């Protein structure tokens, strides 16, 4: 462990889903220029990773360069800190228990009874300090998922309490994100949930140095004094985190409220957040939010439309493009399980994102057909590419029974598998972490739409798939006007397709939304929106 390591711990209270990930990333952004910051997310669920969790239940699965499937908060970490995270930074209780049980079988506990304390907490501590050591970290931002009081989080809370004891209170600060409701009909902010949440944290031996109040409006002086009194913090250590037009306002708001100064004083460090560049981009986003110079309407036709977080990175990609092109992009989720062409007529562009399973397939194909036939700018992602190929095979090449092996039924052989299983996937039965995952090179064909967008013939993008375009059909596709414009480095797997005669009809097997940055938007989203203008 680095001698002068500083640690910021972010916990949540009252309710989940109020933005701990964005809050953690925003605080980290204030320190990124002066310290080597490493974000860590602790999740109490027993899954090894979120790779097999339905996006409707937990939000999108974020894929890293190293192939790790991690919590969606890592998208915020990467975008706010402009770094490439590692899968080891996502500590799940599933990983911890798995490691402990393996150690027990190997006899590493020397015959002792294996218990939650000290063995689980020691394993969590060991993992945290190993990350700090391997990354040569100067500051750790540790976000504990869920809310204080959740049974799943008790051991993580106890672990950070022990860490404070071991490294000294001058090297660690605790930040508690809470919710201050204003019930309808009362028109008054209520501090009691915050008080109870902090008391629960106090019972676990942790006393927050900073309380961040998530609310619809700035806290009144009366509520601020009450929280300060009953939660044992100074009034200036109670920070507003109100609803904003874009999440990129939050680090600027924290900067203006002196969050970096409060934490720097606690940790005895100096920091210069350098917030100017972000402020300029946020200014563009805000001005277009309130008085847009131009509005582009984009339909996202997906099967996980019940939860906005299912496609969080796609929506962030569009925000980044809007900031750089000085316009407002409005994205609307359309459920592909119940879709017809009439839903699409008001949109300037269409995105068909990734997904798994046959549910919602045909609705997505309707959207793709509509975009192709009406020359509507279109971007297909992962499954979106596969379905674009199926639609083209059926409606242009005349292969009416074209389909994917993902829809293969044991009692009904597939006659025209234009999409089939990757060779390396055959024989694999486990679902978790077994796909083609992570960053891989893609070779671009010159004089194509995508080559002109990227300006180079070799790129690195992130993948998450089991199926690919069947090469037996590529010649037929290209004779009918579809171009395979990107391949794997061995030229065996099609990674990008496009239809040159259309304004913008591009589909990729990878996920461009996973590497977008507000300062550098993903190229395919940039191309899509430019075609819509």
Curated annotation (Swiss-Prot):
Catalyzes the ATP-dependent amination of UTP to CTP with either L-glutamine or ammonia as the source of nitrogen. Regulates intracellular CTP levels through interactions with the four ribonucleotide triphosphates. The keyword NAD does not apply. It catalyses: UTP + L-glutamine + ATP + H2O = CTP + L-glutamate + ADP + phosphate + 2 H(+); L-glutamine + H2O = L-glutamate + NH4(+); UTP + NH4(+) + ATP = CTP + ADP + phosphate + 2 H(+). It is an enzyme of class 6 (ligase). CTPSs have evolved a hybrid strategy for distinguishing between UTP and CTP. The overlapping regions of the product feedback inhibitory and substrate sites recognize a common feature in both compounds, the triphosphate moiety. To differentiate isosteric substrate and product pyrimidine rings, an additional pocket far from the expected kinase/ligase catalytic site, specifically recognizes the cytosine and ribose portions of the product inhibitor. One of its GO terms (molecular function) is identical protein binding. Mg(2+) binds at residues 73, 143. Allosterically activated by GTP, when glutamine is the substrate; GTP has no effect on the reaction when ammonia is the substrate. The allosteric effector GTP functions by stabilizing the protein conformation that binds the tetrahedral intermediate(s) formed during glutamine hydrolysis. Inhibited by the product CTP, via allosteric rather than competitive inhibition. This is CTP synthase. Pathway: Pyrimidine metabolism; CTP biosynthesis via de novo pathway; CTP from UDP: step 2/2. Residues 297-533 form the Glutamine amidotransferase type-1 domain. GO terms for biological process: 'de novo' CTP biosynthetic process; pyrimidine nucleobase biosynthetic process. Keywords: ATP-binding, Glutamine amidotransferase, Ligase, Magnesium, Metal-binding, Nucleotide-binding, Pyrimidine biosynthesis. The active site is at residues 382, 511, 513. Pfam families: CTP_synth_N, GATase. Homotetramer. L-glutamine binds at residues 355, 383-386, 406, 466. InterPro entries: Class_I_gatase-like (IPR029062), CTP_synthase (IPR004468), CTP_synthase_N (IPR017456), GATASE (IPR017926), GATase1_CTP_Synthase (IPR033828), P-loop_NTPase (IPR027417).
